[in-house]
Amino acid sequence: MSSSDSIRMVLIGPPGAGKGTQAPNLVERFHAAHLATGDMLRSQISKGTELGLQAKKIMDQGGLVSDDIMVNMIKDELTNNPACKNGFILDGFPRTIPQAEKLDNMLKERGTPLEKAVELKIDDELLVARITGRLIHPASGRSYHKLFNPPKEDMKDDVTGEPLVQRSDDNEDALKKRLGAYHDQTEPIVDFYKKTGIWADVDASQPPETVWSAILKALGKN
């Protein structure tokens, strides 16, 4: 890898694997930008940029935003977002081989090729237990877990005593469908990065601090 405190990587992992915990750690440690494709899309649309307007038109018609628009959005961030000076953590992209190839070509043209693709791996059954047990206090956003972090009183917020709710998309069948789709989509991407020699996997079933150490080790930064 290049200079000791820059980073150019893709973060891969299913819902609930801890990307939301680890991405901020990476941002803080490397002063790099966390480029989550959903956030980027929303930002470009709200700013009314040309790319944002193109994307909005497609989305309003129920279509999927093209690979070219997504790659150009990433290029735009790399060019105009000062936080990208020390590198980037791409999250949610690429999801297909053509996307991975287009991304690679664009990054190589800029002279900033990817250095690592880190996959957070976790057993589906464990993920389902993790996610379906999540309980939320809607007003404050405080979250609990039936198994790992239960409230003092069943289904009640510790601070206010108000009822807790379970997110509707956190139910088991919906989650298993999402995980099935995730694996179908991700396996070819993992193979692609294995072939290019930049892939590394991390066991995401461990406690967050252990996962963090393993990510740094995978990046050669421990």
Swiss-Prot record:
Annotated GO CC locations: cytosol; mitochondrial intermembrane space
Record's protein name: Adenylate kinase
NCBIfam families xrefs: adk, PRK00279.1-2, PRK00279.1-3, PRK14527.1
Region (NMP): 36-65
Family under the similarity heading: Belongs to the adenylate kinase family. AK2 subfamily.
Keyword hit for Nucleotide-binding: yes
InterPro entries recorded: Adenyl_kin_sub, Adenylat/UMP-CMP_kin, Adenylat_kinase_CS, Adenylate_kinase_lid-dom, AK2, P-loop_NTPase
Role noted for this protein: Catalyzes the reversible transfer of the terminal phosphate group between ATP and AMP. Plays an important role in cellular energy homeostasis and in adenine nucleotide metabolism. Adenylate kinase activity is critical for regulation of the phosphate utilization and the AMP de novo biosynthesis pathways.
Location of the region described as LID in the Swiss-Prot/TrEMBL record: 133-170
Residues involved in AMP binding: T37, R42, G63, L64, V65, G92, F93, P94, R95, Q99, R167, R178
Class of enzymatic activity (EC top level): transferase
GO biological process, one term: ADP biosynthetic process
Subunit structure as annotated in this protein's UniProt entry: Monomer.
Binding site for ATP: G16, A17, G18, K19, G20, T21, R134, S143, Y144, Q206
Keyword ATP-binding found: yes
GO molecular function, one term: AMP binding
Record-listed E.C. numbers: 2.7.4.3
Catalytic activity entry: AMP + ATP = 2 ADP
Species for this entry: Candida glabrata (strain ATCC 2001 / BCRC 20586 / JCM 3761 / NBRC 0622 / NRRL Y-65 / CBS 138)
Domain remarks: Consists of three domains, a large central CORE domain and two small peripheral domains, NMPbind and LID, which undergo movements during catalysis. The LID domain closes over the site of phosphoryl transfer upon ATP binding. Assembling and dissambling the active center during each catalytic cycle provides an effective means to prevent ATP hydrolysis.
Location (main, coarse): cytoplasm
Keyword entries, A-Z: ATP-binding, Cytoplasm, Kinase, Mitochondrion, Nucleotide-binding, Transferase
